[in-house]
């Protein structure tokens, strides 16, 4: 009798434990689910082949994302903000899918070359939020398009180049021919001609955004032909333009050779110590495109629940998102005054800057 009573009591205790265990498991599962649904906002960007250290477009975007992360006490990584670097165009789709699997709330594609990959992945993943920088994707509620009036900013550096050249020869080095770089070339050419109709403009393309050696080769040819100011819109390829200008300045400090940078202030890229022991800078100015402002701005809106999917946000002179960089030591006051004059005419609509060469 005692054995039967003990067995019955033991069975009840075991049963109670199972029930409590089941209840505990259910509670844990619910807690885990709640934790996931209430997780902090996360954001990532996929670079083009230039990478975050290209000293140009991608780097500017990454600086904007870092600023957003720090302002919101976020850490770099899958639980905060991060980037995925693309070594080749084949990596675009792979990196976007990796970002989706990592459950980022907002995923940027940095550069127009990621358009096709963003279009495909965003269609397959309609619940994820994406942004394409420097291109437009229409009729997609989970994609925001970010654009810049590059032609307006390029017009202003064209004014600087046209008024600064002593040889009446200036150059333009493009990365890859296309809609975006067309705007840089068209604006620059129009700006030069507006103030110096007799200037010759040598336009060449490297067909790559990440080949500094090609950029240096083109720059060498241009400078040898008498060009004294080169505007590059070529990402990492433009580093070669700076390298060539610095080599020439180092050998002959009296020679006037200038580079106009792009996307971010490239003043530091122009620093050089010449053979006379003195320090110089071959950066005339830079045509800034505040990708950092755009990236930070959209991330802030998305975090607040204001993701404007299906729209295009365009940044221009009116928002100081394009224009000349802060370092202007190598530009005369008279030239800067002309720049302000033409800037106001563009903002007022008195000058319509072309988008195609």
Swiss-Prot record:
Superkingdom in the source lineage: Bacteria
Signal peptide: 1-22
Lipidation feature positions (S-diacylglycerol cysteine): 23
Lipidation (N-palmitoyl cysteine): 23
Keyword Membrane attributed: yes
Membrane topology category: Lipid-anchor
GO CC annotation: plasma membrane
InterPro entries according to UniProt: BMP_lipoprotein, Peripla_BP_I, PnrA-like
Subcellular location: Cell membrane
Keywords: Cell membrane, Lipoprotein, Membrane, Palmitate, Signal
Family to which the UniProt record says this protein belongs: Belongs to the BMP lipoprotein family.
Name by which UniProt lists this protein: CD4+ T-cell-stimulating antigen
């Amino acid at each position: 009798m005692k054995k039967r009573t003990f067995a019955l009591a033991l069975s009840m205790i075991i049963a109670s434990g199972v029930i409590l265990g089941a209840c505990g498991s259910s509670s844990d599962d619910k807690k885990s689910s709640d934790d996931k649904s209430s997780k902090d906002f996360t954001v990532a960007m996929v670079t083009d082949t230039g990478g975050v250290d290209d000293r140009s477009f991608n780097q500017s975007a990454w600086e904007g994302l870092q600023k957003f992360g720090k302002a919101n006490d976020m850490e770099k990584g899958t639980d905060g903000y991060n980037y995925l670097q693309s070594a080749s165009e084949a990596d675009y789709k792979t990196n976007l899918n990796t970002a989706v699997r990592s459950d980022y709330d907002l995923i940027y594609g940095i550069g127009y070359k990621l358009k096709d990959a963003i279009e495909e992945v965003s269609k397959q993943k309609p619940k994820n939020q994406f942004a394409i920088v420097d291109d437009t994707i229409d009729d997609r509620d989970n994609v925001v398009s970010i654009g810049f009036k590059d032609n307006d900013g390029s017009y202003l550096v064209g004014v600087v180049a046209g008024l600064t050249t002593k040889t009446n020869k200036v150059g333009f080095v493009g990365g890859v021919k296309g809609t975006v770089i067309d705007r840089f070339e068209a604006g620059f050419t129009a700006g030069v001609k507006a103030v110096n109709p007799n200037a010759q403009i040598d336009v060449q393309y490297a067909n790559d955004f990440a080949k500094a050696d090609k950029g240096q080769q083109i720059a060498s040819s241009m400078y040898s032909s008498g060009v004294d100011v080169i505007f590059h819109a070529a990402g990492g390829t433009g580093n070669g333009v700076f390298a060539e200008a610095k080599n020439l300045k180092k050998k002959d400090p009296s020679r006037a050779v200038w580079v106009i940078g792009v996307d971010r202030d490239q003043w530091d890229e122009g620093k050089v110590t010449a053979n006379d022991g003195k320090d110089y800078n071959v950066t005339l100015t830079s045509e800034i495109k505040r990708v950092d402002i755009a990236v930070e701005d959209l991330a802030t809106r998305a975090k607040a629940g204001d993701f404007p999917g299906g729209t295009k946000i365009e940044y221009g002179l009116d928002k100081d998102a394009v224009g000349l960089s802060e370092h202007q030591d190598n530009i005369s006051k008279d030239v800067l005054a002309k720049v302000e004059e033409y800037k106001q005419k563009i903002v007022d609509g008195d000058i319509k800057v072309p988008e195609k060469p």
